[in-house]
Amino acid sequence: MAVQHLLFGVRRSCTFILACRRTAFQSSRAFTSIYTQFKVTDTKNIFRPLVFPVRVASAFTFTSAAVAKDVLLFEHDRTRFFRLLAIFCGGQFLFWAYLGHFAFTSLRDTRKYSEPQKVRTELGGFFSFDMNLGSNAWRYGFTSGCLIIGGGILALALLFSRRSVSRVILHKGGAKVSVYTQSPLGPQRSHHLTVPLSQVACYAHRQESHSFIPLKVKGYKFYFLLDKEGTVNNPKLFDITVGAYRPL
């Protein structure tokens, strides 16, 4: 009797285990089917609820040209150098002016009184010619040449000082720019001009120029030169205002 109960218990246990295995197998097949269907049909939308739209502003929106107050973009004071340049060029002008005055007053045409003395000049051994240093042509020509050389040196020094920039100021609102040039009298007494920002353009990037940054102002001949040894106080603001390229 006990043996029959034992066999009956073993049989019921085997039946229960087989039923559980069959149920688990069917459940796994159903789950695999559902997973396959979900993978095929919903792959595109499965992560869509996790995506949040994010706006990324441009880098230039963080730097605006409409400043709330005057901003000093560039500064480079070379008053001492331009004082020495003014002294040197002024001395050159006085020297050539004196030499021209000496030639005009000392060289005289002596043909009226005696036979004019001629000087024979040879150039490189190829050809030679006679010069009458007392003739009016030589006297006027030598005097004019001295004045032209002295005046040219002084004019070049003045032009260089008028095109060398000491300060660049962006005014409140960002609509106008003031450009101050170098002067031997100091930065407070230097020549300056105030123009709209739309009339200022830079034809070379400040990092590409080796010695000077060329700045073009509409209505003015030649470039305004910004020395690379100067200080750019706000590089980003400089690049989008004065340092930007604009067709003029």
From Swiss-Prot:
A biological-process GO annotation: mitochondrial cytochrome c oxidase assembly
Pfam families: TMEM70
GO molecular function: mitochondrial ribosome binding
InterPro entries documented for this protein: Tmem223 (IPR026100), TMEM70/TMEM186/TMEM223 (IPR045325)
Primary location group: mitochondrion
Record membrane topology: Multi-pass membrane protein
Residues spanning the membrane: 46-68, 84-104, 140-160
Signal peptide region: none
Location(s), subcellular: Mitochondrion inner membrane
One GO CC annotation: mitochondrion
Keyword Endoplasmic reticulum: no
Keywords: Membrane, Mitochondrion, Mitochondrion inner membrane, Transmembrane, Transmembrane helix
Function: Mitochondrial ribosome-associated protein involved in the first steps of cytochrome c oxidase complex (complex IV) biogenesis. Stimulates the translation of MT-CO1 mRNA and is a constituent of early MT-CO1 assembly intermediates.
Family: Belongs to the TMEM223 family.
The name this protein goes by in its record: Transmembrane protein 223
Organism: Danio rerio
